């Protein structure tokens, strides 16, 4: 048992995407026992036998043995076709893990079909002996399993009655098997690197070597069985009874004609990761994308928050190995501001270039290209200046295809002399003899010096070479004829802030080739492009501006049963993560050494095993969903948040030893958190309103208007406020009081407001006035002398404070362009705003600069400011409430100083 430390957890319980990083079917109930029927066992034997056949192929290198094995492969395929009562998804997983599969099963079957007519006499006897061995094995199985005889007999009757009755289905199933082999080779290309780079050129085996091959076949089959058992045990948590019930033969019978064979494996893998709750949406997305050769240009993904839109789309695109780029428009817009357009351009090009580089490296290893390098990441600059630059770089990335490289390579190889080619063949032969017999069967080049005795083998090897070249073309088509995908998440933020960028991205197919008179891009064909827009609600038609409303994939809300299934599967992550965040020093969580999915909770003398914890968790999830689903079904993130934070409160009485972990105490545990649930679900749609009212942003008594400035900056702001509110004629009183060394004399009590006083007079008094720079400094000096007994010395510190206030926009230069004021309109007999409405800090660009620039000295990096002479007109841009709070903090009677 190993203790889990608090810092070992990487899961954020507040984020739905992070908590679901593990496989969606990662947990199988400890109380569930996997029940397998004889039919289920028979299917497992068939899949394992087919895998053993592939293992045997890698152990032998003769053409005769390959013909023999093809017959076994055909028998296993026929048995798979006939046994369509149930299809075990575990068999697909074993096929994924089998790294010794051939690259192109169609080509091998074609070759073997041609060789069947010539070599019937060679392998008929062997097949008969194999059948006898199979019969002996079946007899032994019948003796050992007497209870299942009737089921097996019934299943064999079904096989005999339904044999080849549905030829269309058998053809489709064969094509699907071949397609699965191709998909698995592409998915497992990283594992097949060494095998694809090596080409075996072996001699035909003599009769004395037959015993060696048979023993090697048996050893390989045993090793493959052991490896498959280990892998099935290791990855057994990916599959449970629910998957086996959902994925049946009838399910695949309807599924195979509707889904392109090239992406069938990616579809199944995405279902394993994301769950069957989004099967309908994934099927709709596949119908729109097709085989990714010519997808729809723009696709819209819509759904409420927490419904798995981004997770499903990104996982499916990754599993198809298509070059793609992902941009979160929310982060790009609100983190970059004005430069959001350049950030989005750079993110798209950077992600796309990295994926294209990975695609090219995979293509090189598949086709054995070593003398050529291509790095698309070097085409992407660090800063994308404008839209034209973005489209030109994107055109270069999408117009690259390695066809010319291969053609040049083949022509140079054909020009070589025969002696050089023979020497190269000998070198290859020596290398392959030293490395062993571990490469693919399609790459077996059995070239011999004994041409008279082995003419048939030599011809077959030549045909294999041709097939390998066609396989190269297949991978070229597979990789470079597919389209590129751009995923734009939270697109509504891009529409609000940069509608021109949204317009360009949705019409990227038109702009990528530039103007019609650009001859450099005329004859270059580019790859297809698909834009996937992810949003919460549909965009209005006028946003698309002539572009038809794109087809939509709706991610509707999860049902209550779906929510329960998802939370059941989050047991390993959410259950213990929420307990680790709970502040309890006595609580300790352990996991089992041989199985890290089984946990044990210990607190003082209370010990809870994994089965008990899981049973309590399932009952807790049922209670939470039944109570709060109606309130939080539109936001799954909130439901996850409630579930994770209520769990420690729910299980606390059991951990404290107050209640026993039995079924009779479940009602007491529910009553313990019933009050918390009612509070959490009360006004769930507006539960932040009271927090905002009581927050620092809306409460006058808190720190809302407090500005973190120095002492002299605050004094300068108060002096600027007095200069903007009082007329210059009233400054004499302040100067006289300062010269005499006394305090300010309080003004006489103001007269009451005159009823006949016009609104224009009141507005003129309330509007802040501009003031000169020398007047601002003099009033500030008066405040320092009278209230703090200091003098304002214009040193470097004061200059720096003045520079900071101007650059922050608190004090700005007075001009008709950046000053908003009310003026009288003689035509309308009223008042109106003059200039820009609002703060000059937000509406002018001349006030933005770095704090390192100084307005008192000219530097190369400084922005263009007006000269700050003593009579420069300035204006204050700070709210009056903020000034009053500063005056209260500094104990300055502001109302008494305003005349």
Curated annotation (Swiss-Prot):
Upper taxonomic lineage = Eukaryota, Sar, Alveolata, Apicomplexa, Aconoidasida
Comp. bias (Low complexity): 207-218, 455-469
Q: What is this protein called?
A: Origin recognition complex subunit 5
The EC designation for this entry is 3.6.4.-
Per UniProt, the keywords (alphabetical) are: ATP-binding, DNA replication, Hydrolase, Nucleotide-binding, Nucleus
Binding-site residues, ATP: 303-310
List where Acidic residues composition bias occurs: 105-160
Which PANTHER family does the entry mention?
A: ORIGIN RECOGNITION COMPLEX SUBUNIT 5 (PTHR12705:SF0)
GO CC terms of this entry: nuclear origin of replication recognition complex; nuclear pre-replicative complex; nucleus
Question: Biased composition, Basic and acidic residues: where in the chain?
Answer: 227-237
Reaction(s) the record says it catalyses: ATP + H2O = ADP + phosphate + H(+)
Q: What does this protein do?
A: Component of the origin recognition complex (ORC) that binds origins of replication.
Family under the similarity heading: Belongs to the ORC5 family.
Q: Which Gene3D superfamilies match?
A: P-loop containing nucleotide triphosphate hydrolases
* Annotated compartments: Nucleus
Which intervals of the chain are annotated as region Disordered? Answer: 27-47, 100-166, 194-238, 409-469
- Assembly and oligomerization: Component of the origin recognition complex (ORC). Interacts with PCNA1; the interaction occurs during the trophozoite stage but not at the late schizont stage.
Q: Name one GO molecular function term.
A: DNA replication origin binding
The biological process GO terms on file are: DNA replication initiation
